[in-house]
């Protein structure tokens, strides 16, 4: 079945993800809103681009690692085996690749593609991250989700994918995301460090 969440306005990428997660978490055995200790109808949650930049066939590979190989979070990685991106201009490739490198350097999460939006989660991972709360609402949201899963000692794994850019429409990503990534990630990391002292 396909369920479509209608939102009143565009409130940011992170807000859209959070609304989707909250909807899935609300589908527990009692169907009575978000109750973090209930049994959920959905075992896993997957996020992906709806323009087929992410190949739906790769969902099956993700599922194997979540259900059979003991992983808690599986990332469709553009950079695990090099740079596997089709139809991106070089400046977009560089922004994404070095953005992931910077995020990895700051967070120390051993993942090559921390900015990937093609991710499979066990639902308890989403539950525990949502309990802690999410700070970012832009593209850094993706990094924060993986960082917090890592901090919570969940098992993260990357599978290589080929990302093919859309043939119609335009990406909303631009250089305005850089300040959030540069300064926001530093703040997030420092906050985590001092919370453990």
Per-range role (PLM):
Residues 48, 77, 162:
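Conserved residues at the C-terminal ends of beta-strands
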Residues 152-197:
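C-terminal catalytic/acceptor-binding lobe
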Residues 32-51:
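Short beta-strand-to-loop acidic/aromatic patch adjacent to the donor-nucleotide binding site
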Residues 20, 51, 122, 149, ...:
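Residue-level signature of catalytic and energy-coupling elements of molecular machines
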Residues 2-3, 7-26, 40-42, 56-139, ...:
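Acceptor/aglycone-binding surface of glycosyltransferases and processive sugar-polymer synthases
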Residues 52, 61, 143-144:
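An aromatic- and histidine-rich active-site surface loop
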Residues 7-9, 48-50, 159:
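Cofactor-binding loops of NAD(P)H-dependent oxidoreductases
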Residues 110, 133-137, 146-163:
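Catalytic donor-sugar/metal-binding loop of nucleotide-sugar-dependent glycosyltransferases
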